[in-house]
């Protein structure tokens, strides 16, 4: 199997699913006939039984085989939104680490993403829908609970000397009245919007 095939399958497992255009952006950038090349490769991987596909959507949505989600799952737009955040991060710098829906234990937060990007750790929440103030406070309280547990100091990515609690970045079209005295919270409509906010502060 070619290294690009392996990289595509690795991303399909990591992101749960990818649209044909996502695969082009991540693995066929710069090719003259990127669409044709991608279609040919994905057709072969499908024939080999390495991937599954939902052809009822345009562009096609591809899944690893076996897949952890159904081809008709309601969470597909959510996972594709996570891919979109990853692609936006890449435009500035490739993340050193990028985990999709990492698990931290009972009672703790369930971020959509944990990433180390531009030498900084971030929890990222990708919000496609509007949450009530109560729901946002409940989300935030789980981060606070994790902060006070000090378990984050044992994370394998932590430096030996200083320990850092990740910043929380909420990707949302709505602004929420949320604050923590223990860690930084950012709200932005996109990674580009977030970078513009940082540029203004700098």
What kind of region is each of these model predictions?
Residues 1-70:
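Nuclease-adjacent, charged terminal/linker segments that flank catalytic cores
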Residues 85, 103, 179-182, 196-197:
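Structured N-terminal alpha/beta-domain signature
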């Amino acid at each position: 199997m070619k290294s690009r095939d392996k990289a595509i399958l690795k991303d399909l497992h990591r992101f749960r699913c990818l649209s044909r255009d996502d695969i082009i952006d991540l693995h066929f950038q710069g090719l003259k006939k990127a669409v044709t090349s991608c279609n040919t490769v994905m057709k072969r991987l499908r024939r080999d039984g390495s991937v599954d596909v939902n052809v009822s959507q345009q562009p096609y949505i591809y899944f690893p085989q076996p897949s952890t989600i159904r081809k008709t799952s309601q969470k597909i737009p959510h996972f594709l939104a996570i891919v979109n955040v990853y692609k936006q991060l890449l435009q500035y710098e490739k993340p050193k680490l990028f985990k999709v829906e990492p698990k931290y234990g009972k009672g703790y937060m369930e971020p959509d993403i944990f990433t180390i990007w531009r030498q900084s750790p971030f929890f990222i929440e990708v919000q496609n829908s509007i949450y009530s103030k109560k729901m946002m406070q409940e989300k935030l309280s789980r981060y606070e609970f994790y902060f006070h547990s000090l378990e984050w100091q044992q994370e394998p990515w932590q430096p030996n000397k200083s320990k850092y609690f990740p910043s929380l970045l909420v990707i949302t079209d709505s602004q929420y009245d949320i604050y923590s005295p223990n860690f930084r919270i950012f709200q932005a409509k996109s990674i580009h919007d977030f970078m513009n906010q940082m540029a203004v502060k700098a």
